[in-house]
Amino acid sequence: MNTQEKHQFEPVLPQAHDDPTLSKPPIFFNRTADKGMIKRLIAWFLVHYGLADTVSMIEDLKQVGFQYATRAGISLGIEDLRIPPTKPRLLQEAHREINRMEFRYQQGYVSLVERFQKVIDTWNGTSELLKDDVVENFLATDPLNPVYMMAFSGARGNLSQVRQLVGMRGLMSNPQGEIIDLPIRSNFREGLTVTEYIISCYGARKGLVDTALRTANSGYLTRRLVDVAQDIVIRMTSCSPSAYPLISFTKSGKEVVYPLEERLLGRVLAIGAFNQEGELISGPDTAISQEIAVQLMDCDPKEILVRSVLLCKSKRGLCRLCYGWNLGTGTIVSIGEAVGIIAAQSIGEPGTQLTMRTFHTGGVFAGGVTNEIRAPHAGLVHYPRPIHPKWVRTRHGQFGILISEKIEIIFEHESKKTIQVFDAGTVLTIHEGEKVHTNQLIGEIPAHGTLVTGWRSLKSGVDGEVRFDELELLKQRPRSDRTSPVRLDPRVCNKAHLWILQGHVNTFEMPIQLVANIGDKVEKDSIVSTTKQVVSEEGRIIYRYDEKRGKEQTIITHAFGSVQFDGVDAWLPTKSQGIKQSIRTTGGKLSISSQGMTLSATKIKQEGIGSFDWPALAEPSIEEDEELEEAYKKTKDPIIQPTPYPLQYCVLPEQKYVIQAQEGWIISVLGGQSVGASQSLATYVDSQWEVEQGQLSIRSIEYRVHDQSWIQVITPSLVEIESGRGSYHLMAKAGWIIPISTKIRCKDYRLISGSILLGKWSLPISRFAVEQAASYPAILIRPIHTYPVYPTTIWDETINWQRGIASIGSNDWHPRCIAPTYQAPSYVESFKGRQTFTGEEKQEGNKPVEITSKNRRKSAANSSHETRMTQNRTWPIVLADTRIQKGASPIQIEWTWPHAKNPWISPNHGAIAGHIRFVNMTILDSSSISTKQELDHREAQVIPTTQTVSGVHRLTPLLEKTVFSQDDGEIQRMLPFSRALVKPVRTNRSKTRRNASGKTQVKAQARSQAKARSVRLKLKETVKTRSQEKFTNEMKKQLAKSSEGNKGFQIRQALFPKKLIRLMVVLRPVDIMTFATYGARVCIPLGAMIYQGEELFEGASTPISGQLIEIRRDRVTLRIGQPYRVGWQSRLMVTRDQIVKAEKVLAHLLYFKTKTGDIVQGLPKIEEILEARRKKGNEIIRSNLQDFVQQFYQDNLDEGFSRKYASTRTMRAMQVLILRRVQLVYRSQGVQISDKHLEIISLRMTSRVLVEKAYGTGILPGEIIEKRRADMLNQGRTRIRYCPIVLGITKASLTTKGFISSASFQETTRVLTQAVLQGKSDWLLGLKENVILGRLIPAGVGIYGHWVGPHEFNIKQMLKLWVLPPIITGQSTMRAMFHSTTRYWQDLEAVMESPNKLYPVTPYKCYPDTQHLAGLSIWMPEFEFRRFETFTEEEMVAAESLFTAHPNCHARRINNKQLNSLI
């Protein structure tokens, strides 16, 4: 009984009587007696009046109870279930709150997790308020209501069940243990709907099935505990321990779950205790009663020294004082008490009861993350003094004020005034002068507990395209390597929005050629592909992969290289892997084309154009290991073609152009500068352009790249753009190029200086048009100023990238850049091309504008319009059997142009260089050959990019291989393979020159061999190429020779590992919404994302969220979209512009919750601790006992402690840890178990050690023996090196010294077989062994034995009881057993000099009738009946040896006095 209960339970004492016969005054209790009250009454009575009086008092209570029970009965009718009248109002308020949250979620202001937590908390709060109203309603209207009386009697039923009857059933959890955010609003009185009934079945399953299953588990736990502790019996009064433990209160977080006063009750003080005045409260070796505990607590101690089971020195069993009270009687325990069995039952039995309770606490999801603060009453909020607020976001998505110091807040209502004090760390959601209502949530206090993180999947609600809004990804560089490139992490490092723009997604499988183009209008059931798949909806195609391109159409393809993420799927999805195949044949023969193979004997011109973007989550950036590809063609179309990339809308009526640009990087580098490999100089720009009758409007969004190694300073300036509707004041960033012309034919560009900060005045924009001009000026704005944080590192590697219009210098770095820097061509963004600005001479079309590098293109003197291509091929410079770098030099294209040009602009002749990656190959021979070929083109042709794949990285773009025909310059192109490595398995090349004498001179020969593995698909392709080479000999006579070579290709991985899905988005009428503006000014720029409720045009807000895709004079059109808020550290699973279907996982959102102490987790948790299980998987925090033991032991050794002392310290620490962990689980469920029971179990779990080395003992390394025995052996000449271990209760039971107990527990056959082979002995020391053999158990009175008196005793019985219990062995004779000395003396725990001395005194006899026990014999000692004095000296030595051998006896010579003390 604790102090609180004692104060609650104070008997009413009447006045003192004069009658001297009354020894104790009568006591009168005047209060309602419920279950808890009767409990306390019995406990108090037992302490004050003893056991006998308590029994008779309980009998009287029983009679009174029965008497009153028959006076009146309680019936329960359906009318007794009264629903409180406040329920409809509470439900209405909850619905209103949740609808408000849902609206904020649709607007994108709160995330999925914040909405979920708000819903859970709202229903939880409603349920709790309703529960209070149920009680108040019963008290006010009918205090004698049968339901109310039952709930509060404590006999059966409780308030949570009554709440379900007349309140609301509340929240349920699903089979995974997660809360379902749809609560059961009804109660059982009203009846459940079908949905509610289905949901409630989850909870019912927990109640019925789980109880049945877990009761068995709990019973098994009890059985194991009994087995491990059954032989622990109180065997002596005091053991004189050398050390005592300090005990203090047990805390969970900041809450004290096991007060010190409770822990002290029933323990024995180790030393005397004095109060603050120096008076003795209690002496040493005194039991701590309730009164002494209260007096000790008045001194406010932090820790107290007591005697403990863990430090008892008794050889076997325990002593009375170390154990303390028998908690059943409140007195010191008696000798012979089987405390091990009591401890096992005390721990195991509550587990059985706990399984009966299954908790459905609503707050498991965010259980205890915060404690809520509610308003005491309605009124106005007033802050008496100003505070310095720190704005934070609460877990419900609201903005709150985090207070850093203690403050007071006043709530005023008419004449009523309440002052409430809030501690530092509180988050308040109310402001000065705000009006609050009663019980309104005004703040929260973060809970101090172990927070665990969880992930919740955000799924798309509709089909459509992904867009990011102000999203920043984490950029990281490995700490170990400062020179390695920065990698993008898929984690979000800010709070931003992810949009899904609605549209119907159609799916096509790979071999289909699409008929419809971007911008085409399609109707329902129209043909959009060659296989006549039909579109299910009407609409306009706005986005399509792998569009069909004509010869004169602009082609811009882009491939980005490998970006590797940790923690994402092994294969990142790429946005498209489209392939366009076109095959031209000559000679009238038809060639066969298949997906992965081309076989034709005719001359084939084949074009394969890939359409793809960067892999998911990777933003485009130039890095060390990336492969870039550009290919351009001239266009001669009379109007501007829309870009084949994400395009919102394009219409060309009445010379009005509305064009959406593709997002891209602007690399802010002028000619001659270098770009760092981390690409921090890049600014990401998302531009929308509108050109309408001479008016221009621009809106740009800037993306900053987070990098740990760079600081960025951006100098803004102001641009004013004039238009018919008024002026736009835009903040232009350095790095922009602003087009300022009014016509498409020719553009003029003006510099926005990064170093001039423009103020409030406007910068007028000139309008002019040039019909035809020789040059097109464009100026790039100064780059972002970049200041390095770390000192410059020079990187020695050189890489040459050469292209037709720009080449990249090697060994060129900028002194301000960190780590490796390479020079790259700098492109700027246009509204047409991916990385080009547009402008075409005498044409309305596109042409790349390029900021040149300092290595200018080569110019020739002659003036002609022909293109000459020089191709250099270098075969490998081979070292035998070594890993070499194969450098394939790029193709250089030289051309001449007669006109004088502006150096900033280069005309596009359609000739583009290829660049070939470096490939590591193992070549098996050592010769090289070099050839140079020249091809003359009579007309300009596009040379597609040659690109090979190194196979080093996991994620590489499509492989494209170009084979140059040697006949007349026609290009033959291989099919591209996705992530495939196609290498020639065997290649022979030879050139033969024949001269007049007919001798053959071999110029050079090269053979390369490479091995390729086939992953999914084995295809063999044999291509026969016939080529004619012209040779000239010395006699000017031309001979032609045909050479044939067979190439065998093995494809390492198939073109498409599964299948390519082509996707097409169709914008249907239901996906867009048009609003009439009535001439009002539109507030939002074209292409902007607009959130529900924002102002669309003057005086009107939008009822939906979406993107503005069209502005007309009298109306605007929105494309419907859904914004999703993604928070900090969320993991993205999609990339920008990806097409997704409904229910696709977009991101995983992070949330926090506290560890809950639900008993559903509780029982397995207790089992896990007591079994000392090692958890599987990689834990961040080590929590299993095995790891703790090793770590703690090592730490002690490192501190310089000896092995023995380090082991002892480790064992003590583990005992305390086990005790604390189990107590926390039980206490969290309100179950109270005394420490001493857990101490007995933890003592058994930590009493053994693992032998590492044993010298001269016969003990093998890896054996588990008792620590006490190891220390005893170490006292002699032998040396055992051991380390501490923690054994689970099952393992501890199976490794006991006696094998009968182990065999009866588990694995009977194995244990008995092992015992026979090892010749084990069982000394029958425990209770279980004796019960099995039908002997008297060594507990209770059986522990004393029977003898006549101090001197008239029976030596045979004395030795039998104290010294030699029966020995059970598998040996055939006693002598044989004695002579297998190693094992036998191991079990006897000491080595005797001469075992032969035993025989005259202790002849053993075998009892043949006992051989039924698995072939084992029982040997019983036989002694003659004579007095102790008649023993000879020799016999005395033998008897002394027996005492020494027995675990309970000390090694000493025995005389009368000592023998008497044993008795």
UniProtKB/Swiss-Prot annotation:
Binds 1 Zn(2+) ion per subunit. GO terms for cellular component: chloroplast; DNA-directed RNA polymerase complex; mitochondrion. The lineage of its organism: Eukaryota, Viridiplantae, Chlorophyta, Nephroselmidophyceae, Nephroselmidales. It comes from Nephroselmis olivacea. It catalyses: RNA(n) + a ribonucleoside 5'-triphosphate = RNA(n+1) + diphosphate. It is found in: Plastid, Chloroplast. Transmembrane segments: none annotated. GO terms for molecular function: DNA binding; DNA-directed RNA polymerase activity; zinc ion binding. Disulfide bonds: none annotated. Its cofactor is Zn(2+). Coiled coil: none annotated. Residues 836-869, 987-1007 are annotated as: Disordered. Residues 987-996 have a biased composition (Basic residues). DNA-dependent RNA polymerase catalyzes the transcription of DNA into RNA using the four ribonucleoside triphosphates as substrates. This is DNA-directed RNA polymerase subunit beta''. It is an enzyme of class 2 (transferase). Residues 860-869, 997-1007 have a biased composition (Polar residues). Keywords: Chloroplast, DNA-directed RNA polymerase, Metal-binding, Nucleotidyltransferase, Plastid, Transcription, Transferase, Zinc.
